[in-house]
Amino acid sequence: MAAGTETLKRTPLHDRHAAAGARLVPFAGWEMPVQYAGIRPEHVAVRTKVGVFDVSHMGEVETSGPDAEAFLQRILSNDVSKIAEDGAQYSVLCKDDGGVLDDLFTYRLGPQRFLTVTNASNHEKDLAWFKQHASGFDVEVHDRLHDYAMLAVQGPDARGLVAQLAEGELPKRFRTTTLTLATAPDVLVAGTGYTGEDGVELLLAPEHAGTVWDALTERGAVPVGLGARDTLRLEVCFHLYGNDLSEDRGPIEAGLGWCCKEDTGFIG
């Protein structure tokens, strides 16, 4: 272990990564697997079969209350009113001057309840921004970082593999559902991802992450680290905060005008 890593946060799957021989590196305050067998074979596995990523370092913010939709409409760039009750939507969080604080996915969990997934490096900043702008809205904002582990199962065979473990039907693209998965209850399954492949992302209680990870890898899902996650997203031109987006660069300049709905009156 490199000097100083004892201060880094660890995901619930850390011991499994170490046992699998993963190369662990500091990333956004976490000790994360950058690769297992190697970036190239992991990249190919996702493009041709199925890979599984531990993305539990990503943050979660829950927003609820009578004004939850109106509040998110104010701070997020996309049209939050268009998110179906089981839907998901990509957007950006902007400063007053239009600089990008983060790019995010928001899931509608109910008529007045939403879950927004933040980038790991921006979670505390995003949470503070949410709370700062909640004044005047009948809304509650809660940090859910430690309430969820998050796995991404991606590739042409991803849905078929997850379906073997699921008690119920998987959601379509940009939709969500809650299922029991490999005996793990109340898993939020979202038809989203960061690879350009079909697949799902799983948000579940941290104590069940190991059970689901084991069930997936035992059935052929290849563990994939952050290295291949980056090459996969780069290959399909998905944005990376800190490279393509920053507080000094607006969403229009970054090519994200499609998710900025000016008629909603969002900040930025």
What are these regions (language model features)?
Residues M1-C94, G99-L101, G227:
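Acidic, proline/glycine-enriched N-terminal capping motif
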Residues D79-H133:
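Well-ordered mid-protein domain cores that form the structural environment of catalytic cofactors
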Residues V55-P66, Y107-L115, V153:
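N-terminal glycine-rich flavin-associated loop
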Residues M1-V34, L109-I267:
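Conserved, structured C-terminal
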Residues P41-A45, G99-D102, K131-A134, A184-V187:
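Short hydrophobic/aromatic-rich motifs at helix boundaries and adjacent loops
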